[in-house]
Amino acid sequence: FGTHRADVANVIPPQRAGAIAAAAGVADRSGWCPIDPVTLESRLRPGIHVIGDAAIAGAMPKSAFAANAQAKACAAAVAALLRDAVPAEPRLINTCYSLI
């Protein structure tokens, strides 16, 4: 990165899924977790579902609103899978506002 001088600096490290995702074997080389878009189940470790910032979820941003929508879709998918039913394809949406 070189040498930088600043009176105030906001340093943000490279982002990736949390250490628990790597330890569970659900994160790939990108540092994120590839998922099935219908069930939100890990493509690397079947039986583990990943939501929120850790998930590679298409065009969904890394936001709490997106994670909330993913959580509801994931719960519905898990409930369907437990009944041996085919999960419905979720219609994930996002609303994100920045007041800055």
Locations of regions flagged by a protein language model:
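Active-site lining segments that contact anionic ligands and/or coordinate catalytic metals
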Residues: 45-46, 93-95
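Central beta-strand plus flanking loop segment that forms part of the substrate or channel wall
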Residues: 19-21, 94-99
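FAD-site-proximal beta/loop scaffold in flavoenzymes
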Residues: 4-69
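A conserved FAD-binding loop/helix module that cradles the flavin
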Residues: 54-92, 98
